[in-house]
């Protein structure tokens, strides 16, 4: 494991950081370091200590509790500062799938972000920004993680669509500030239409990518950003660590810089493409495992909420994050018409409606491993 207890690990770190009274970074130094792992802690354990839900752990790790508390305080300050500048935080439900030794799904649960995971996330984002800014001003060849401003036409289409639900976003000369999308996500939080509008907002934005030009990160509202913190699992981070080490040792001479100027554009294009391919493979694998899991529950009843509506039926999301479809052909009590503006199915005779966020009880009627889909039929409305 990368952080096994009682081991020393070589690393590169933004160290000797100084901050003013408002915790704004005023100075830093990036150097080679050695991480001394005194104790290996889990997110669950640290979160339990911070929330007070695990008193036994608080006593066992009493000398670390003040450190965790300071980390929590600093994390909150960093996150709030990011929020104020307009950073967008999509909080889509993620799945945690437990497999047996043969790769068969045993259980599926929602993966929940907690205080401990947010601390590490905030600190990693800050480290990434710090490294990106440092090497931008060194004017040496480098890899950046960039996220371009959304296409004006897509933002106009999003604006028209959300107006159907009573929301709006402000644009100026076809451009939008990330804070507008942040405010939209805040307004829809907890509403029945949140899953739909949040996904549409994400799809209306451009994909982040790796580039050699530091053009900023729209979603994070950051002027400088890179991927530095995960060299053991992401190639761009590893490439950056190589450049950093050469810079630290004074080896980035003219010849090496010319080498990187020729190499890095190819690295950026290839790693961006491979990242998209890996994400697609991950999504398809998750769908497959969910399909395999639900195949063991055909005929069983589950409670869920309607997460999407279309002219061919509606999707139902279960508490374990599995999503399946109730096909319109299974709604046999009436002839249902899809209202595209309100995202509702309404019965022509009885006027019964099925809409976003509506609780329903469903029976698993089938699965398709090839298509990676789950089919439901209604048991009865809640």
Model-derived features: positions:
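Conserved, carboxylate-rich catalytic/transport cores that coordinate ions
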Residues: 1-9, 15, 19-382
């Amino acid at each position: 494991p990368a952080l096994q207890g009682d081991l020393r690990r070589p690393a590169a770190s933004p160290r000797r950081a100084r901050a003013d009274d408002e915790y704004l970074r005023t100075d830093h130094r990036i150097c080679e370091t050695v991480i001394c792992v005194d104790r290996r802690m889990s997110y669950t354990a640290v979160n339990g200590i911070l929330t007070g839900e695990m008193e036994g752990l608080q006593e066992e790790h009493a000398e670390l509790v003040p450190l965790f508390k300071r980390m929590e305080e600093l994390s909150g300050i960093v996150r709030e500062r990011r929020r104020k500048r307009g950073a967008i935080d999509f909080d889509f439900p993620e799945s945690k799938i437990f497999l047996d030794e043969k790769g068969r799904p045993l259980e599926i649960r929602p993966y929940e972000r907690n205080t401990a995971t947010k601390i590490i996330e905030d600190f990693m984002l800050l480290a990434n920004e710090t490294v990106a800014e440092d090497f931008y001003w060194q004017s040496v060849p480098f890899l950046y993680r960039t996220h371009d401003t959304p296409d004006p036409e897509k933002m106009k289409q999003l604006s028209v669509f959300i107006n159907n639900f009573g929301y709006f976003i402000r644009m100026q000369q076809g451009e939008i500030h990330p804070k507008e999308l942040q405010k939209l996500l805040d307004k829809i939080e907890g509403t029945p239409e949140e899953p739909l509008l949040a996904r549409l907002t994400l799809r209306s934005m451009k994909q982040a990518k790796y580039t050699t030009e530091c053009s900023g990160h729209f979603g994070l509202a950051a002027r400088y950003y890179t991927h530095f913190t995960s060299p053991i699992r992401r190639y761009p981070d590893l490439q950056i660590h190589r450049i950093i080490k050469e810079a630290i040792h004074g080896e980035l001479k003219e010849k090496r810089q010319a080498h990187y100027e020729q190499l890095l554009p190819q690295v950026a294009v290839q790693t961006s493409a491979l990242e998209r391919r890996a994400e697609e493979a991950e999504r398809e694998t998750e769908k497959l495992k969910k399909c395999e899991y639900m195949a063991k529950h055909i005929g069983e009843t589950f409670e869920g909420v309607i997460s999407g509506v279309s002219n061919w039926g509606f999707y139902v999301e279960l508490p374990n994050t599995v999503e399946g479809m109730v096909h319109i052909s299974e709604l046999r009590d009436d002839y249902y018409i899809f209202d595209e503006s309100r995202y509702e199915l309404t019965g022509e005779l009885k006027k019964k409606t099925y809409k976003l966020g509506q609780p329903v009880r469903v029976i698993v009627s089938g699965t398709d491993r090839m298509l990676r889909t789950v089919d439901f039929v209604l048991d009865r409305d809640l």
